[in-house]
């Protein structure tokens, strides 16, 4: 019974409350921080559980009154409302019981790379970056372009955006994958629709304690920053390229004004990429024969199509099609896609865990 599964949450919440009133524990700042964080994580389940148990009690009380000559009709009507509340709370609680992704509250690195399609892919990479920036602004996230390589006709061959804010990873993790665009390029005189693609990677920002890098595994090269066509734009060796020798991962950064800043930024991106690589390897080992319908970073899979002539955006993972591509891109209204993706992922998680 669901109620029996919820009681340990109430017990643990009360235990923590008691501990946080103990002077001995209050003198240990790190322990207080740890317990407070645990209590905050339990609180939504605890509050929903208290409501749920109250509804169950009221249901039993009204059932006992059904055969009462004076209160029977009123009890039946109240019972209908209580059962609706019960079902609603059960759904809310099931979602709350889904194991949390440890990365959900982290900041992210959002990496966009132009793929097939040449200049048009680079231009769309720029358009998608602008849309993500608008989305971040709507959500109250702070953004910073960490690294960029501009396309010869505009847009970007590659751009890395740091997105800071509570829940940034939880909202944007579903954006990882191949994004296909179908539209008529400005340079197309015959009006033909061209298809191009870009890839998006979503990587959580990693704390130093979460991943260890052996300095001997790194090759660090410094050079002068370059602009369009490779021409030098700096008279000092401020650009930094870091190669992780065991994996072959390479990160280059030249956007900062100093070599130190560029190295620091490049190391952050490298750590995120290494963590991303490790997570992929771990998930590959754990993955059952039945793959998740909603991926959260598989760059090999086409996840979404942006069809400009039809004003259509389609997310292929959940077969969602919206005919308001212009509004979504112009306003950064990605929640219209992200919310259904999250709901689908939650339903999948509930089915798997048999909550």
Swiss-Prot record:
The modification N5-methylglutamine is found at residue 231. Methylated by PrmC. Methylation increases the termination efficiency of RF1. GO terms for molecular function: translation release factor activity, codon specific. SUPFAM superfamilies: Release factor. Residues 280-307 are annotated as: Disordered. Keywords: Cytoplasm, Methylation, Protein biosynthesis. It is found in: Cytoplasm. It comes from the Bacteria. Transmembrane segments: none annotated. One of its GO terms (cellular component) is cytoplasm. PROSITE patterns: RF_PROK_I. Pfam families: PCRF (PF03462), RF-1 (PF00472). Residues 280-293 have a biased composition (Basic and acidic residues). Its main location: cytoplasm. HAMAP family: Rel_fac_1. Peptide chain release factor 1 directs the termination of translation in response to the peptide chain termination codons UAG and UAA. PANTHER family: LD18447P (PTHR43804:SF7). This is Peptide chain release factor 1.
């Amino acid at each position: 019974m669901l109620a029996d599964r919820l009681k340990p949450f109430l017990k643990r919440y009360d235990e923590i409350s008691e501990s946080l009133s103990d002077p001995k524990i209050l003198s240990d700042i790190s322990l207080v921080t740890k317990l407070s964080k645990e209590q905050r994580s339990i609180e939504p389940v605890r509050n929903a559980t208290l409501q749920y148990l109250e509804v169950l009690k009221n249901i039993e009380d009204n059932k006992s009154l059904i055969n009462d000559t004076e209160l029977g009709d009123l009890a039946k009507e109240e019972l209908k409302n209580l059962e609706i509340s019960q079902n609603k709370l059960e759904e809310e609680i099931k979602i709350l019981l889904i194991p949390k992704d440890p990365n959900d509250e982290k900041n992210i690195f959002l990496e966009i790379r132009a793929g097939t399609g040449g200049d048009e892919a680079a231009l769309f990479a720029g358009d998608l970056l602008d849309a993500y920036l608008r989305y971040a602004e709507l959500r109250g996230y702070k953004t910073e372009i960490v690294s960029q390589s501009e396309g010869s006709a505009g847009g970007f061959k590659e751009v890395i955006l740091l997105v800071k804010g509570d829940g940034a990873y939880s909202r944007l993790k579903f954006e990882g994958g191949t994004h296909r665009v179908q539209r008529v390029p400005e340079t197309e005189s015959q009006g033909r629709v061209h298809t191009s693609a870009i890839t998006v990677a979503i990587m959580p920002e990693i704390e130093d304690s979460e991943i260890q890098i052996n300095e001997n595994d790194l090759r660090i090269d410094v050079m002068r920053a370059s602009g369009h066509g490779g021409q030098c734009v700096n008279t000092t060796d401020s650009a930094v390229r870091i190669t992780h020798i065991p994996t072959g991962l390479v990160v280059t950064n030249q956007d900062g004004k100093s070599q130190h800043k560029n190295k620091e930024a490049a190391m952050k991106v490298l750590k995120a990429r290494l963590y991303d690589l490790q997570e992929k390897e771990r998930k590959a080992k754990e993955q059952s024969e039945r793959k998740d319908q909603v991926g959260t970073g598989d760059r090999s899979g086409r996840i979404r199509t942006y069809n400009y002539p039809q004003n259509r955006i389609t997310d292929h993972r959940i077969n969602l099609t919206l005919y308001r591509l212009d509004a979504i891109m112009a306003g950064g209204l990605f929640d219209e896609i992200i919310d259904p993706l999250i709901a689908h992922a939650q339903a999948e998680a509930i089915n798997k865990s048999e909550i």
